[in-house]
């Protein structure tokens, strides 16, 4: 899980 992946895709 990459931080950038979750950040820009808003996977909250």
Curated annotation (Swiss-Prot):
Any matching Pfam family: Urotensin_II
Record keywords: Disulfide bond, Hormone, Secreted
GO molecular function list: hormone activity
Keyword Methyltransferase: no
Positions of disulphide bridges: 6-11
Protein location: Secreted
Any one GO CC term of the record: extracellular region
BP GO annotations: blood vessel diameter maintenance; regulation of blood pressure
Predominant place of localization: secreted
Family: Belongs to the urotensin-2 family.
Function summary: Has a suggested role in osmoregulation and as a corticotropin-releasing factor. Probably involved in smooth muscle stimulation.
Entry protein name: Urotensin-2
Organism: Scyliorhinus canicula
């Amino acid at each position: 899980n990459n931080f950038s992946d979750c950040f820009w895709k808003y996977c909250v």
